[in-house]
């Protein structure tokens, strides 16, 4: 049914177009096409000139109009053919014959310029291309070839300037567009190398140069946002990410980064909206679910956090952070069975996760499983020796509520005490081990 409606609309549009053609004179159609051509709308102008010829196949000015379109497209053969047809339609018109002769001069200039460029005589080539451009400003190949010449001289910004001029003349110039994209990509790769070296200033400058070349290079906006975020300028990071998304609304990584930046600005509502868009575009994007869970956890909305975390480990059963965050939530809720289950998965999938080993040790201690707690705590201390939390949980596991190793417990608590964040708690536990009678009911 839908296809039938679309087909009917197309047929209706064709009849309307035919009606317009037959309701207008060739002069009217020609004048309208000229207006389109001056506005840079080449396809519409071409349709108008062809419509004038359908109305009157002997209407010579329309052939000249098609020649003007052909020269804008860089097609000299088609240009000559259209002028010949104009002459055939109006043999007495000297203007058409003069225009045909002028094309010979353009051919000569272009051939000379290309030959000079092949021979390495760039200055002579530029002279030929400049004269061609001055005499035939609507012919894009002269400035395009000047761009190629500047590329050879490694004057990339001058090259791009000429490629853009070629595209202003002919917005459909695929070679000019490809050349612009190629220059932008080279600058982008250079920027990436600076970024990897940690030279953020040079990287930022190069990414901005990418955008001078090609304002549609959304990855450059994104990388600028990454750098701005890294140096703590979240507001400008947000602006850069939003520019990237204006160019490519399907760029889900951009929405993810935007969500993180907005979260850093305490715009939780905006952050969740951006992250939700990321998973709407890419339902398997586990990291976006994980980032949403961070926000819900921080705002103590544990049920929503569980929902998005369940989604994260559904789309990626090997997503360690999903289990780690789930373990954090169940720890807060003191559901030790669920906490240990999820934290075991987290540490199995990521055996470098210090905090999950620490939390797992704490959960085992709460369950009274001292041997498993010791194993998890030791792993935490091996990964991060100066973190007092791991030593603290090891001390609790060693003491095992008075049933364990007093010396081992004291040694662990002493090491926990070296971490200022854990000093008071460690000193309290040391006193409990040394003076248990003080803490008897």
Give, region by region, the residue ranges found by the protein language model.
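N-terminal leader/linker segments that initiate helical-solenoid repeat arrays
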Residues: 23-61, 72-77, 81-84, 88-119, ...
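Structural signature of tandem alpha-helical TPR/SEL1-like repeats
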Residues: 40-47, 73-85, 109, 119-127, ...
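Position-specific recognition of the canonical hydrophobic site in helix A of tetratricopeptide repeat
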Residues: 30, 37, 71, 117, ...
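Helix-start (N-cap) detector for alpha-helical repeat units in TPR-like alpha-solenoids
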Residues: 26-27, 60-61, 94, 106, ...
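Terminal, low-structured helical/coil segments at or just beyond the last alpha-helical repeat
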Residues: 111-115, 186-193, 197, 396-441
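Canonical tetratricopeptide repeat
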Residues: 31, 65, 99, 111, ...
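Structural marker of alpha-solenoid helical repeat scaffolds
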Residues: 55, 89, 135, 169, ...
